[in-house]
Amino acid sequence: MSETDNFKENLSGNTHVRDTVPDENMAYRQGLKNRRRIVVKVGSSSLLHSSTNRLDYHKIDVLVRELSDLKNRGKDVILVSSGATAVGREVIRRTKSSADLVEDSKITVKQACAAIGQARLMMTYQRFFTDYNQISAQILMDKNSIMENLSKYNLYNTFSELLKFDCIPIVNENDSVATYEYSVGDNDNLSAMVASLMHADLLILLSDVDGLYTDDPRINPDAEYIEYVPHLDENLMKMAKHSTGSESGTGGMSTKLQAAMIATKSGCDMVIVNSRHMKVIHEVVQGRNYGTIFRADPDPDFDLQDYLESTT
């Protein structure tokens, strides 16, 4: 029996009963309307034109409008945004010859691109959020921001005050100075860490995929779509097979399932949904059947700091 067959068999077992999943899925999604603190993560591929790797202002405008509307409805909103390194790299490429980019993979080049791109990205967000009468703020962090007690305390207080001021914090990893030891490495996990730290009710991962499949649908046309995961187990984690991310991003399905583990064990629902149309954020929060939902499954023994230390 193949790994995919094993997975399908498990899906119809005690924890994933196919006959009851559709009704249970839709009934549970209705509760998303009542979630009060929402973290939204957007990946690089969702912010850029695929043909040019330059910012897609139309999609960013819709994203900001969706988040602003959530804020106006009384929700706490935190945005975790990738894209800085990709934006900075494109700026450098427009000012340097191809020969100068031979060492583009060097960590120092990536960090320089992140520094340039983060400023450009925040300037763009600031302009769009201002158009919708919203205050945005930048938070740059890494794994050590949560692992070290004082840093974690300060980070939590900063987030809390910004939310009290009706701000929308915009979070990214501090890639321009992050060291390998304390680098999270992808914003899927970073967004789950933020959701856990801030006791969020819902984490939405905007991606270039529709959700979770039994296999990579780009390679296997027989891969089956999974819309509802009431419990994240080892068989599900194995299905990711360390899939790769997009050309401009770093997160594949493996990182998304790691994020789901952090979020759900922290008592937070998580949805993976395609960002092809940014208005999907509204559909998810309204409880409609978009993307794959991972149901909150609080684990009283789960400690975020302990988990991060075990993965460092």
PLM features: what roles do these ranges have?
Residues S2-T312:
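C-terminal catalytic "cap/lid" subdomain
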